[in-house]
A protein has these predicted regions:
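Core catalytic lobe of class I
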Residues: 1-279, 283-292
Length: 292
């Protein structure tokens, strides 16, 4: 891993093209009074991210509901293609003044256009696909049997079952025992069968006693996004790494990591957290590198 203190636009300009497999970041939301938080990252910053990502690489950026449009436009104007929007449900936030209770944070999901066909791009650059099958959301109970609300058992068209009168009854496919297909909602929703990956806000224990960063994301959340959008043994860029949660998650998932932050204070915290994670990873997985 590498943690760098500096302006991310300046730092990235020293890198060559097509370096990273993915960018997963939690940048300033443009909602504060400080100089670094008076606006969302500029098009020029995202252009440097675009330049250093491999063709087909994904760029995920957290943002506020109020300025999602501005973040998405800047990312798109840098050359990315907007592919999706993920909603992280954050139901523990408290309402402020005369407003609705904040309950989610959106994530812009964008992709650097791939070269030629998706298969050829993946063969050449090692990215462009997302890993959904290995990141299914596990059933809370036994996989549902029979038809359940929400379509856990799907009708299949083109494979005919029996015919009753003039109506055709088609076959069905049972629910996948490994869980539901991951969705673009991350959070907790009441259900007989868990529909979404659950990622509560980071606890004080997870942050560390000396971590005073105001918007620390949970490690499980970042690890989940990395597993889906960054190939195994790939590299993750975080140009606004803060206290290093993305780096810790990347190391847990056996990905390379480069983090950049303007604050020397937070890069020191990020370096310390990643160092602890590195030692823990080596102790728990002494033969990890030999398995690949």
């Amino acid at each position: 891993y590498s943690i760098i203190n500096g302006n991310c636009q300046d730092v990235l300009s020293t890198y060559g093209e097509n370096i990273f497999h993915s960018c997963i970041t939690d940048p300033p939301y443009g909602m504060g009074m400080d100089d670094w938080d008076h606006s969302v990252p500029t098009v020029e910053i995202w252009q440097e991210v675009y330049r250093t990502l491999k063709p087909g690489g994904f760029c995920l950026s957290f943002c506020s509901p109020e300025l999602y449009h501005r973040m998405a436009v800047n990312v798109e104007d840098a050359g990315f293609v907007i592919k999706d929007q993920i909603m992280w449900m954050t139901t523990t936030k408290m309402p402020k003044h005369n407003r609705l209770k904040p309950a989610h944070e959106p994530i812009v999901v964008a992709q650097k256009p791939y070269e030629g066909s998706l298969k050829n791009n993946h063969d050449k650059w090692g990215c462009g696909l997302i890993d959904t099958d290995n990141n299914r959301v596990a059933w809370e109970k036994e996989p549902p049997k029979g038809w359940v609300k929400g379509g856990a058992k799907r009708r299949t068209f083109g494979r005919e079952g029996k015919t009753t009168g003039s109506q055709k009854e088609f076959g069905t496919v049972d629910a996948n025992p490994n869980g539901r297909y991951p969705s673009n909602i991350i959070g907790s929703v009441q259900s007989d069968h868990q529909k979404y990956f659950y990622a509560p806000r980071a606890t004080r224990k997870e942050k560390g006693k000396d971590n005073d960063h105001p918007t620390v994301k949970p490690i499980d959340l970042m690890a989940y996004l990395i597993r889906i959008y960054c190939p195994i043994k790939g590299s993750v860029l975080d140009p606004f790494c803060g206290s290093g949660t993305t780096g810790v998650a990347a190391m847990r998932e056996d990905r390379e990591f480069v983090g950049i932050d303007l604050s020397k204070h937070y890069t020191e915290i990020a370096t310390q957290r990643c160092s602890v994670e590195e030692v823990s990873h080596l102790v728990l997985n002494p033969l990890a590198d030999m398995l690949y």
